[in-house]
């Protein structure tokens, strides 16, 4: 029986422009059904592999315009995705030291050194409107589907950890109010800043560093064996986002942005401060009591999230320091 389910074309992005032979093979396979080319030792952090992997993961979200929904489970595409995942995961494990002490790792996330400096520090003090728009463009690839990658872990949890995690996700999805869904608030902010808020609209302009952060979430969410790493990634965001969100609110106010622009990050200043305790005590505590062998994976998730975030932060600061765009191809606008 042929599947009849469809996704509205209004919610489905166009296939991106390839960035090398690997992503070209994936795009061609999605467009006309040809078998995908095998993995050819592409740079695991590079533009080509990260875009190819992102496209394969996107089949599990909203897909692409003109691509049949059942391609999500195409055996050839799944086999290629597994090759690319292994290359990416191996690179991460090679670059990230092993750790076992989850509580020490989380305590470290709560301390921001006086000399800490990142993109949100720059935007608060010196950032210009075009840089703020670029930052939002980078973040849109995740925040327009905020909480979706993490939702895959729900059936892989049990007991108190599951109940508490669902409570946090309930908040992310607006607590029953669609107008308060975090993905919706982000789209409202994008429009207020004059940035295209269509889902997937910026896939062609964000670099591999941006794609890798989202790919980490998708990879960990889709693999039960990586559920500990997914929760480590999730904890990292929840424990570290409040100060950065506050800096972004201040940056927007300094640049004259109104409440429609600031609402998303203002919401995260308060919500993530509450979520911090829920993640530590309500999710990770019960999880590690029941499955202490997952501690190493949780630490890996924390460190992988920090590692990839650091790569993107370095790119942003380097390009902005030179007065250059951090996007691959974007006409800069605004003061």
What are these regions, as identified by a protein language model?
Residues 1-335:
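Non-heme di-metal
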């Amino acid at each position: 029986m042929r599947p009849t389910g469809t996704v509205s074309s209004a919610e489905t992005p166009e296939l991106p422009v390839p960035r090398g032979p690997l992503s070209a093979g994936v795009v061609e396979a999605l467009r006309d059904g040809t078998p995908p080319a095998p993995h050819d030792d592409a740079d695991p952090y590079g533009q080509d592999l990260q875009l190819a992997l992102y496209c394969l993961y996107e089949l599990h979200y909203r897909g692409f315009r003109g691509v049949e929904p059942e391609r999500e489970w195409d055996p050839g595409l799944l086999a290629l995705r597994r090759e690319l995942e292994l290359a990416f995961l191996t690179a991460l494990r090679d670059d990230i030291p092993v750790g076992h002490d989850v509580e020490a790792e989380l305590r470290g996330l709560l301390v921001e050194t006086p000399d800490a400096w990142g993109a949100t520090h720059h935007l608060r003090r010196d950032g210009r409107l075009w840089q703020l728009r670029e930052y939002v463009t980078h973040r849109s690839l995740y925040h327009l589907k905020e909480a979706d990658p993490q939702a895959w872990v729900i059936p892989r949890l049990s007991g108190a950890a599951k109940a508490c995690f669902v409570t946090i996700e309930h908040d992310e999805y607006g607590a029953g109010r669609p107008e308060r869904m975090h993905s919706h608030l982000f789209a409202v902010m994008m429009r207020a800043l004059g940035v295209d808020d269509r889902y997937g609209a910026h896939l062609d302009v964000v670099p591999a560093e941006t794609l890798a952060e989202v790919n980490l979430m998708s990879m960990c969410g889709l693999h039960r064996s990586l559920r500990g790493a997914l929760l480590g990634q999730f904890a990292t965001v929840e424990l570290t986002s409040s100060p950065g969100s506050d800096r972004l609110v201040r940056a927007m106010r300094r640049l004259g942005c109104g409440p429609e622009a600031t609402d998303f990050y203002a919401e995260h200043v308060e919500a993530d401060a509450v979520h911090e305790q829920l993640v530590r005590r309500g999710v990770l505590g019960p999880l590690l009591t029941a499955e202490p062998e997952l501690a190493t994976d949780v630490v890996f998730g924390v460190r992988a999230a920090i590692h990839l975030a650091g790569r993107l932060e370095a790119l942003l600061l380097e390009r902005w320091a030179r007065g250059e765009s951090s996007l691959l191809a974007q006409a800069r606008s605004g003061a």
